[in-house]
Amino acid sequence: MEKQKSAAYLDESNVRGYLVKPPGGPAPLVVVFMEIWGVNDHMRVVGEKLAGLGFAAFVLDFYDGALFAPPDIQGAAAKFKAVGDEGVMDAFGRAVGFFKARKDVAADRLGVMGFCNGGRLAFLAATRYPHDIGATISFYGGGIDNPKDMLGRTSILGNVPRLQAPLLLCYGAQDTSIGPDEHARVAESLSRANKRYTMSVFPDVGHAFMDKAGPAEARATETGWRMTKNFFTANLVKGHA
């Protein structure tokens, strides 16, 4: 019988989130920073997809189980503001320490990824924990450098010199919330700091294309997951990294 992946919501040692492990031995760990809505069905699917690609995935729940859904952006924004960047980074640090003490995942080969607000948080984590993180993926990371940010988030481009891990940034060309001017500022900061990064802009799609229906979104999602697999394999899997 084919072995199945294991999936469960973890609430232990002040660490909370959705943990999915592929069958077999300890796999490289990817911590997923959720969108502003919480650990919803889409974020759980992301974790399961990563496990299907051979990675252990932990969707970090820094809302302590609270969930929001469109159109309640105000409620979600208020929740995130109450936690803040520091609260999220503290939760991430606890999770890293927790998993490094376990034998069922390979937390010494750690990647991070995030979507929307989570994409910014993945970028931030890579600059706060540069010695722990081996690869970072940010899908349409909003607020990395937006002077008119609706959540009051400050630019994190000043942290770029601390970045050590390879970085993959993915954006939708039709995303009105993250325009080409922001892409350019992010790229310029990374290039000036001599950092290793790849920026990919997907045509014909807007924000949150990895969670939307439509032919263009389907093509972009397929490509996005292929890039995710290749990027994490190249940087986290023994024999490739």
Label for each model-derived stretch:
Residues 1-241:
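N-terminal cap/leader regions of alpha/beta-hydrolase-fold enzymes
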